[in-house]
């Protein structure tokens, strides 16, 4: 089954073709992402109306490009998957409208996919994928969650952020220190030049019971350190390193506790922050110490993309799950309400 996947929940337009007749990573026939970073840079954040308009301009050309790279014609598609939520309502409607129109014209089934389920399942596209049960750390600009995965479509929320998501904290901290948009990746690169231990910030909520997170206090602590410093380039790098170390250690500690609570030793990491090199190394070490595995998607599939939507949609389409023939999106959507596959 060849499934066309469309992602348009925020500021990236993603399209992919996933072929269930192929094995492992080869099943991803083609994928392409158009980023709107340059469009939103002057505003310091995503402008929803501009995001929607840019999806309108870019989506169909990206569909044509992806099909060409896969060596397929539009008539070779057996199903269409699209992000139905959560996300920006206007951006979601663009992707849903194109997807439903293609499915109707081709007379093939379509299914709306939960954006975070797409992220959660992205590591399963790689060779030697993990098998449920496992714990997933979903860590991005909009979400920081620990989820127990009992089976595909059977999810239990173990903990989540009470304020800023980890990726949001990266972005806001970078902005406070004058780094260009988008700040998170810039801050991570800057941290490579920092000296560990020069600045040591709190590891939020690790001394409390439960698996929830909080990063707003850490962000304030970094702001105060930056304001009181000489604000030199080396100091900026040292503060960035101290901040990154605090976030990575906090996430690692909570992940280990989540594994114990769920009774497994397999951790799956997905979302934009999942591309962070230091986080990957730390969780890999933790999993090996526990005799388990840490599984990640390739870095290109950590950020928003159509591949994860095509894959998650293929699983549901193969299970006979289709969405009603109407353009409908869910900007706020609890993943625990999803049906099992």
UniProtKB/Swiss-Prot annotation:
Task: Output the GO biological process annotations, alphabetical, semicolon-separated.
Answer: tRNA threonylcarbamoyladenosine modification
Catalytic reactions of this protein = L-threonylcarbamoyladenylate + adenosine(37) in tRNA = N(6)-L-threonylcarbamoyladenosine(37) in tRNA + AMP + H(+)
Q: What is its EC number?
A: 2.3.1.234
Single GO cellular component annotation? cytoplasm
GO MF annotation, one? iron ion binding
Supply the alphabetized keyword list: Acyltransferase, Cytoplasm, Iron, Metal-binding, Transferase, tRNA processing
Q: Where does substrate bind?
A: 138-142, 171, 184, 276
Q: Does the keyword Cytoplasm apply?
A: yes
Report residues binding Fe cation.
115, 119, 304
Q: Which InterPro entries match?
A: ATPase_NBD, Gcp-like_dom, KAE1/TsaD, TsaD
Query: What does the Swiss-Prot or TrEMBL cofactor note state?
Result: Binds 1 Fe(2+) ion per subunit.
HAMAP family per record: TsaD
NCBIfam families per record? gcp_kae1, T6A_TsaD_YgjD
What the protein does comes down to: Required for the formation of a threonylcarbamoyl group on adenosine at position 37 (t(6)A37) in tRNAs that read codons beginning with adenine. Is involved in the transfer of the threonylcarbamoyl moiety of threonylcarbamoyl-AMP (TC-AMP) to the N6 group of A37, together with TsaE and TsaB. TsaD likely plays a direct catalytic role in this reaction.
Please give the name of this protein.
tRNA N6-adenosine threonylcarbamoyltransferase
């Amino acid at each position: 089954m060849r499934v066309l996947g469309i992602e348009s929940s925020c500021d990236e337009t993603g399209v992919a073709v996933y072929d269930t007749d192929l094995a492992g990573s080869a099943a991803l026939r083609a994928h392409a992402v158009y980023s709107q970073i340059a469009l939103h840079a002057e505003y310091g954040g995503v402008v929803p109306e501009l995001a929607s308009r840019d999806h309108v301009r870019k989506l169909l050309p990206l569909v044509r490009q992806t099909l060409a790279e896969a060596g397929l014609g539009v008539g070779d598609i057996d199903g269409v998957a699209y992000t139905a939520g959560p996300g920006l309502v206007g951006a979601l409607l663009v992707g849903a409208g194109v997807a439903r129109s293609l499915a109707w014209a081709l007379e093939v089934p379509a299914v709306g996919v939960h954006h975070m389920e797409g992220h959660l399942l992205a590591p399963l596209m790689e060779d030697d994928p993990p098998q449920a049960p496992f714990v997933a750390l979903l860590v991005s600009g909009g979400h920081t969650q620990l989820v127990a995965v009992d089976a595909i479509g059977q999810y239990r929320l173990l903990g989540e952020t009470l304020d800023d998501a980890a990726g949001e904290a990266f972005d806001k901290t970078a902005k406070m220190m004058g780094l260009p948009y988008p700040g998170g990746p810039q801050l991570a690169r800057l941290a490579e030049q920092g000296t560990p231990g020069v600045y040591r910030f709190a590891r939020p909520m690790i001394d409390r019971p439960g698996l929830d997170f909080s990063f707003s206090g850490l962000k304030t602590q970094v702001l105060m350190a930056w304001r009181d410093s000489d604000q030199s380039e080396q100091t900026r790098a040292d503060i960035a390193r101290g901040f990154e170390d605090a976030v990575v250690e906090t996430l690692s500690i909570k992940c280990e506790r989540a594994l114990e609570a769920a009774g497994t030793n397999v951790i799956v990491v997905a979302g934009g922050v999942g591309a962070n090199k230091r986080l990957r190394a730390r969780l890999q070490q933790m999993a090996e110490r526990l005799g388990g595995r840490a599984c990640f998607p390739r870095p290109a599939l950590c950020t928003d993309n159509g591949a994860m939507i095509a894959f998650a949609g293929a699983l549901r389409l193969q299970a006979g799950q289709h969405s009603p023939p109407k353009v409908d999106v869910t900007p706020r959507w609890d993943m625990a309400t999803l049906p099992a596959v």
